[in-house]
Amino acid sequence: MSGASSSEQNNNSYETKPPNLRMSEKKCSWASYMTNSPTLIVMIGLPARGKTYVSKKLTRYLNWIGVPTKVFNLGVYRREAVKSYKSYDFFRHDNEEAMKIRKQCALVALEDVKAYLTEENGQIAVFDATNTTRERRDMILNFAEQNSFKVFFVESVCDDPDVIAANILEVKVSSPDYPERNRENVMEDFLKRIECYKVTYRPLDPDNYDKDLSFIKVINVGQRFLVNRVQDYIQSKIVYYLMNIHVQPRTIYLCRHGESEFSLLGKIGGDSGLSVRGKQFAQALRKFLEEQEITDLKVWTSQLKRTIQTAESLGVPYEQWKILNEIDAGVCEEMTYAEIEKRYPEEFALRDQEKYLYRYPGGESYQDLVQRLEPVIMELERQGNVLVISHQAVMRCLLAYFLDKGADELPYLRCPLHTIFKLTPVAYGCKVETIKLNVEAVNTHRDKPTNNFPKNQTPVRMRRNSFTPLSSSNTIRRPRNYSVGSRPLKPLSPLRAQDMQEGPTSRRPKSHSGWCTVCFPPALASCPCH
């Protein structure tokens, strides 16, 4: 077989071994396996209704939970085709030349959507444009049907003049369409552009013409919602997310607990209390918050002692969230990195190879942690001013969401002790301020290793998180892998039960870390232990 060497084929010609699929396996989060076909999200709405805001925010969320998503903004394509914007006349429905250009831009954008979803491993594409006519939406539906894409429409409806004016002044004044123009001229031209679109605008009709489509109408920035014919899991998650976000001004403060006794010793995990300097930080944090004069501030902590002790010093009510607890290091809890490297050298190497996907034996991975923290993100999106006192890995995951960081960067984000991250949501992202309180603390950050393996050396086999792929371009059936501590429940033969009680037998080759090098990860068919 292709997975065996020539010597193995000669000595064991009767034996077939599964090919090594791990080196070519695409890194993908759990959520990607919940999409059974690519989805095209189509934005609808007049200009200045927050479509781009929703597109970017939704894309950031979907990428964070592990669904590869990309925005295709039609304005970018239009500015490539027409280098200089002159006035609202370009958007008149009776400007035939401009209409041809706009349609051609849409077709080019859809071709890029097709390439992303079919050739670049994308799962969801967001088509950010007005799409206000039925003709344009029918064209998109035909395109999706030809390529077997699901379609979900998101229509933003707003008739509040104050909201529209604020959106124009906050976002459109800085648009590439208006270089070096004053606010009054921008407002006048853009309002006329909106009037051009109103002439041909046909909102989605849930009672007749569009009753069979899947969509959500977001009315007046989330005051009301209308949801129609949600098709699948991903669409339901999109609806749930859009029903939780808001645009009211607020500030989110993220910080770690004060320095703990285990921090001083270099140990990970555990439930130790604050050190002397950690208690000093808690007092400094209280003084900082009093100076900020924040109204209606909510304080959240984990259920571990070090975050609770930090919050206790603030003298304000706080809520404890178990899902804010630090990443579970399993068998490595309360150990230093030097101890882990000495006792479990292969585990130490595995984590350095792929920190986001690596799961501690009996513990969690960063990927697991993102799944665990999703309810926190939903609640943060619903809230006003919040202070979250958490832990290094937890804070990295939360920061990655707000700063739109990918799986490669997430585990290495710097979140030092005794430092506050002040996050202020803005039009298309998040403004970040780093505030260091004047209290010394140990450095718990580990830089990303180089991982420069020699060309003739195969990296240590990666133990992946448990999943069952729903589909694969590879025709060879992959073995189902289970993480340590998560093996399937099934009756054990007396011999197997005895093996488990007495430890590894002579048939089971051992690694330096004590794990079987053949069946690690467990349940591989080629392992003689099975």
From Swiss-Prot:
<dbReference type="GO" id="GO:0003873">
    <property type="term" value="F:6-phosphofructo-2-kinase activity"/>
</dbReference>
<feature type="active site">
    <location>
        <position position="158"/>
    </location>
</feature>
<feature type="compositionally biased region" description="Polar residues">
    <location>
        <begin position="1"/>
        <end position="15"/>
    </location>
</feature>
<dbReference type="InterPro" id="IPR029033">
    <property type="entry name" value="His_PPase_superfam"/>
</dbReference>
<keyword id="KW-0378">Hydrolase</keyword>
<feature type="binding site">
    <location>
        <begin position="45"/>
        <end position="53"/>
    </location>
    <ligand>
        <name>ATP</name>
    </ligand>
</feature>
<feature type="region of interest" description="6-phosphofructo-2-kinase">
    <location>
        <begin position="2"/>
        <end position="248"/>
    </location>
</feature>
<dbReference type="GO" id="GO:0004331">
    <property type="term" value="F:fructose-2,6-bisphosphate 2-phosphatase activity"/>
</dbReference>
<feature type="active site" description="Tele-phosphohistidine intermediate">
    <location>
        <position position="257"/>
    </location>
</feature>
<feature type="binding site">
    <location>
        <position position="78"/>
    </location>
    <ligand>
        <name>beta-D-fructose 6-phosphate</name>
    </ligand>
</feature>
<dbReference type="InterPro" id="IPR027417">
    <property type="entry name" value="P-loop_NTPase"/>
</dbReference>
<feature type="binding site">
    <location>
        <position position="136"/>
    </location>
    <ligand>
        <name>beta-D-fructose 6-phosphate</name>
    </ligand>
</feature>
<feature type="binding site">
    <location>
        <position position="351"/>
    </location>
    <ligand>
        <name>beta-D-fructose 2,6-bisphosphate</name>
    </ligand>
</feature>
<feature type="binding site">
    <location>
        <position position="428"/>
    </location>
    <ligand>
        <name>ATP</name>
    </ligand>
</feature>
<dbReference type="GO" id="GO:0005524">
    <property type="term" value="F:ATP binding"/>
</dbReference>
<keyword id="KW-0808">Transferase</keyword>
<feature type="binding site">
    <location>
        <position position="172"/>
    </location>
    <ligand>
        <name>beta-D-fructose 6-phosphate</name>
    </ligand>
</feature>
<feature type="compositionally biased region" description="Polar residues">
    <location>
        <begin position="450"/>
        <end position="476"/>
    </location>
</feature>
<comment type="subunit">
    <text>Homodimer. Forms a heterodimer with PFKFB3.</text>
</comment>
<feature type="binding site">
    <location>
        <position position="256"/>
    </location>
    <ligand>
        <name>beta-D-fructose 2,6-bisphosphate</name>
    </ligand>
</feature>
<feature type="modified residue" description="Phosphothreonine">
    <location>
        <position position="468"/>
    </location>
</feature>
<feature type="modified residue" description="Phosphoserine">
    <location>
        <position position="483"/>
    </location>
</feature>
<protein>
    <recommendedName>
        <fullName>6-phosphofructo-2-kinase/fructose-2,6-bisphosphatase 2</fullName>
        <ecNumber>2.7.1.105</ecNumber>
        <ecNumber>3.1.3.46</ecNumber>
    </recommendedName>
</protein>
<feature type="modified residue" description="N-acetylserine">
    <location>
        <position position="2"/>
    </location>
</feature>
<keyword id="KW-0007">Acetylation</keyword>
<feature type="binding site">
    <location>
        <position position="197"/>
    </location>
    <ligand>
        <name>beta-D-fructose 6-phosphate</name>
    </ligand>
</feature>
<feature type="binding site">
    <location>
        <position position="366"/>
    </location>
    <ligand>
        <name>beta-D-fructose 2,6-bisphosphate</name>
    </ligand>
</feature>
<feature type="active site">
    <location>
        <position position="128"/>
    </location>
</feature>
<dbReference type="Pfam" id="PF01591">
    <property type="entry name" value="6PF2K"/>
</dbReference>
<feature type="binding site">
    <location>
        <position position="392"/>
    </location>
    <ligand>
        <name>beta-D-fructose 2,6-bisphosphate</name>
    </ligand>
</feature>
<feature type="binding site">
    <location>
        <position position="130"/>
    </location>
    <ligand>
        <name>beta-D-fructose 6-phosphate</name>
    </ligand>
</feature>
<feature type="binding site">
    <location>
        <position position="396"/>
    </location>
    <ligand>
        <name>beta-D-fructose 2,6-bisphosphate</name>
    </ligand>
</feature>
<feature type="binding site">
    <location>
        <position position="355"/>
    </location>
    <ligand>
        <name>beta-D-fructose 2,6-bisphosphate</name>
    </ligand>
</feature>
<feature type="binding site">
    <location>
        <position position="193"/>
    </location>
    <ligand>
        <name>beta-D-fructose 6-phosphate</name>
    </ligand>
</feature>
<feature type="modified residue" description="Phosphoserine">
    <location>
        <position position="493"/>
    </location>
</feature>
<keyword id="KW-0547">Nucleotide-binding</keyword>
<keyword id="KW-0067">ATP-binding</keyword>
<feature type="binding site">
    <location>
        <position position="269"/>
    </location>
    <ligand>
        <name>beta-D-fructose 2,6-bisphosphate</name>
    </ligand>
</feature>
<comment type="similarity">
    <text>In the C-terminal section; belongs to the phosphoglycerate mutase family.</text>
</comment>
<dbReference type="InterPro" id="IPR013078">
    <property type="entry name" value="His_Pase_superF_clade-1"/>
</dbReference>
<dbReference type="Pfam" id="PF00300">
    <property type="entry name" value="His_Phos_1"/>
</dbReference>
<feature type="region of interest" description="Disordered">
    <location>
        <begin position="446"/>
        <end position="512"/>
    </location>
</feature>
